[in-house]
Amino acid sequence: MKSFKWKENTEEKDDEEKTNEKEQNKPKEIDSKTEQEAKQEKVSEADNSVKDQEGITNKNRPEDISYVDDSTIQAKTALTVEAITNIKGHLIESDQKLADERASQYLQTLTNNAVRYTTTFGISEISDEILIPYYHEIDFQGSDKELPSLFSFETFVNEYYGTDLLTYENEKFKTMMCDHPALSRSSEIFKVNAYKISIKWTGETFNPSIGDPSNIGTTSLIKNIAYVGVHNSDNYKDRKLYSRLKMFLELAANCNIILKGCATRPLGIDYELTKVSKKLNGAKILYNDKAHIIYNGIYHPVTPFCDKVNDILKEGDVDIDFGKIFKYGREVVTKINTYDILNKGYAAIDQFTAYLINMGMQRLLDHRMNANSYKDLTQANYPSRVSLHVFDTLLDEFLYVYKPTDQDWEFCLFVIMIDKEVRSLIMAKTKQMMLSRNLFGQSEIGLKLTNLITRRVQGNIAKNAADYFINVMSSGSIESLCNILCSEMYARFSKFNIECSYLETEYLDLFKFLEILLAFIITPRLAWWNSHKFGKHLYDLMSVFCRSELIAYEARYGCFIKFERSAWVKVDKHVSVYGENDLYDGIYFSFLISRTYSAEEIKAFPFISKIYSLIEPLGDYINLDRKTRAKYPFFETTVRGYLPCSIISYTDITTNNPVNTRVNNIGASIIDLSQRYFTHKPTKTSTKEAYDLILDTIGNTANNLGILMHSTVAPMLATLYDTFLFFADGFNKTSPWVVPRKLGYSGYNVYADRNKSDADRATYLIGGRAIVIPRNLDSTNSMIYTYIGIFVHGVVRCDMVTSTGSYITSSHYDPDSISIMPFNGSEITTLALKVVNHSKRINTVFTLFNYLHSKSTDEILSPVRERLSKFWTTSNARALLNEITRIFNCPIERYFTQMNAYDTMHSDPRVYKPTLYSVSSTGNIDSVQPANCAVNKQYEFGDTYLNEMLKVISHVAFDDELPLFRQTEGLVCGYFTSSSNSPDDYFSVDEDTLYFSIDLDEHPEVFTTVGTNGFSIQLQFKKGNDDHAYTNPMSKDIPSIKFLINRIGNLNAHFVQFINRMLSTQRHLIVLRKVVVDYNVITLGSWNDYTPTSSNVFDQFVKDRDLINIKLDFYDTRFIIQNQSNQLLSQYLFESYRNITPLKDFVVMGGIFGNPNRAESKLTDINKDIYCFGDDNDQTTKYFTSKKSKRVV
């Protein structure tokens, strides 16, 4: 792990070394370097040896790191972030002193009954718990819980034979079991009275739990269809396929498991040794290991069983060479000093689980976070004045931190763009960071301004003006400021609503001009990209204050224009119907477009001709180098952000700055407009003078805005732009009226195939359409801009208000040093890593859905896809996606739900390899896609590690050869009795000589109909030289017949009924050669456990002649003990069916019961196909569940 030391960047000198020509507007000289700064410089020199390096090697790394101030950081401590800044003298008071003792009484009295307006930032109140980790850690520290495994042992105990294990237990072995849970688990599994030990599915050891695919439920793979006729048997097949798909998905959701804290304990065996105990004496055993048969070779009460376990180790056994490949415990892979960081463990889990854990861990090791990468990620999330230095401490903190690849960050951007909740989480963090820095305060200007207006202006006008500013003050807050700045940062994702509440008298509506025009300075993106609303408010105001000028302007230039064929042309549209879609289609208010006016035009349109010069963008772009170095995602190809104005240091700022110049121009234009307006109105001279004074006062007071924007807002935004939190811009400084195209997402290559037929389009989403990404609903009142312009101060404040303007004096500095901590960049780094890991999990969900898509040609999930392809409808696709998202706990189905133009819900998830597109306002994909941003891009779905894991999971889920799927082909129906049965017993069709065979597929003519009144069924055939014909199926004269047929559906229903009546005589059989049987093997411990059934299985085929798949139970009687008087009589199995091939069973060992020293007669052989002793293919000790190659494909 690395520790990080923060210190202030000291490359820039203090301003005391410069000659200042404007002393009256400059702060007092800041004292020379403090002692702390001197110490920091020394630390900086010492840090150069490790800066920009992976870190000191373990060989040379000191245990402690000492700093020059004699403080010591222990090398074993986890990651710490220490931020030290000494930004001198700004903020006399914090925003918490809004209603301090000097103003609170009067101000509260004024604002108590004022109408309040709020600024909302439309983000959802959500927690980062919605972000699902890509890796799932299981910590075994201090716990004896077992390791996860798909399979484990299942013990069948003969309850009718009361042998107590403890009667024969060895006391020394019992003591050893207490220290080694794996030994006690093994003894518990291989009990004295266990008649059978088999393998069972244990998917519940995972989270989420993995269901047993052999349990076929009622849910079908195909939705909303009725199974009738020849397709009726498909219902069972679809339900079986669904159960396997469900298991596949649940296992895929558990691919990335990290096992932590797995301890080992050595075995100490100090009594009579066996072959196994000699090998294991002193061996380290995993404390959390599962049961293993080999432990019973140390000691077992049933001596023959213990001997049998030891016999597998006899010298010369080529299958198992214990001394070379049988391993226990763990091997150290990575070690730091005396600490084991990474180990390779050996445990008795199945090879599939071992493979998935190892492959997931291998990805983590191949892409493990290192100190330099983490430094780049974190450095981007701190202000530029804070420099980062890296020291080497324990690496285990980084050991489990995944380092995202470039492809991961690219897809992360895609998720951020389309997922409103993830965006809201990022936006909420941005707002939190803005508020946490304590950069803004609310000044007392409101109180002074209202007092000034009241003193200098008499009558109702003064009261109305004072009421206006009271409303402005009561509605604004520092949080409202941060809300509007957040909306500005994320304007591309904001559906913004600006309310403009007009006042009781038209004279006061002049203030609305100020509000609207200030918006283009403070939030240029919001103002320009919502110019259909801001322009509408300007239009309404001009309709009042310069109506004749506006009418003449419209007559010459039109109200709306559009750029077509290299020229601006008028658009005939009424203001009342102009909206957002028109703006996106390139239709703009003509007075918002830059144009060159002649002297005659300026004279004719004195106010309107100035509008663009009053709203023209003041700022510029900044390159986001730290973001680029950190590889954080950004939508545009050129990684830069637009600032609303330039950055001017708080030590250099004066009232003569670009923003103040713009504000003064706005004030002058409004004053000029008001003068011309009052010239044509019968207004008292005192009223006009009063308004001149008010406007003059506002104009001078608003000089505060330039200081706020240049020295606080712009630097803060520049810092945030470089962080992970800022991911898209798109503002066009030269043509600000151009709104970036809306964004949507659909299948990759929909753009290229948009001209295909509707049938082809259905394989994507909706042909050439896309789902438009959702936006946040933000709203405010235009008063917020007056509030920001007058009543908010930043790192430089100005509270002096006079009738001639405001001035900055030396008193604006706090004489004491105030330290403003940078916001916690480590929190942003943590959020970034959470988001990218969450997006990687979503990528996995899309990867699986892509494999199921009808357009996919991949081998993975092909059995399911082939079945689905015939029913690839919206409802089936949606049901599948819902199932995937439920299992992965990633509700991405919301990505495919949107409101269409008619406010109705639309949802179609049939998107293959989704990507972003630029789209029209209605969601149609643009015919030309921009090349300067991340649209029409093919993402990487999955990775090499995931694809390899999915191949193994496919083997588990869909390979019918696995013993997990107890499935056999062929079934014989009739009546059978037997006194014993085992899975190896079966009815041999070819070797049977008791029945006369009739192949109905080759000789369907044996059944005919006879008779004139109605008809009868007749069975006729030739046996030897004799002809046989029967119309009575119950006739005892019919020789015992064995019918053979592939599918009963090939026969007439009446013929099938005839055969069924023949079977009821218990003298005939029918062999269904192509029927697939899913079966369970029920092992009986006593005849009391067996209950014969009276049902006839063939009845199911009579009812459904197309039935080709059925589930049945078979019995194993090998381990029945009859040691009670009521069990001494002979017992038999009575069944209406038999298997025609041997059955499979997960039998590990059987017959461990009876007198412990006389159990040879019942002991079965140890199934070596179940076990693999070693770590072939880099896997752990395990038992196999397949007779295929022990090397996982």
From Swiss-Prot:
Keywords: Capsid protein, Inner capsid protein, T=2 icosahedral capsid protein, Virion. The keyword RNA-binding does not apply. It is found in: Virion. Its main location: virion. The keyword Coiled coil does not apply. Coiled coil: none annotated. It comes from the Viruses. Residues 1-64 are annotated as: Disordered. Residues 1-10, 19-64 have a biased composition (Basic and acidic residues). Function inferred by structural homology with BTV-fold inner capsid family. Homodecamer; each decamer is made up of two conformers of VP2, called VP2A and VP2B. 12 homodecamers assemble to form an icosahedral capsid. Inner capsid protein that self-assembles to form an icosahedral capsid with a T=2 symmetry, which consists of 120 copies of VP2, with channels at each of its five-fold vertices. This capsid constitutes the innermost concentric layer of the viral mature particle. Belongs to the turreted BTV-fold inner capsid family. This is Inner capsid protein S2. It comes from Fiji disease virus (isolate Sugarcane) (FDV).
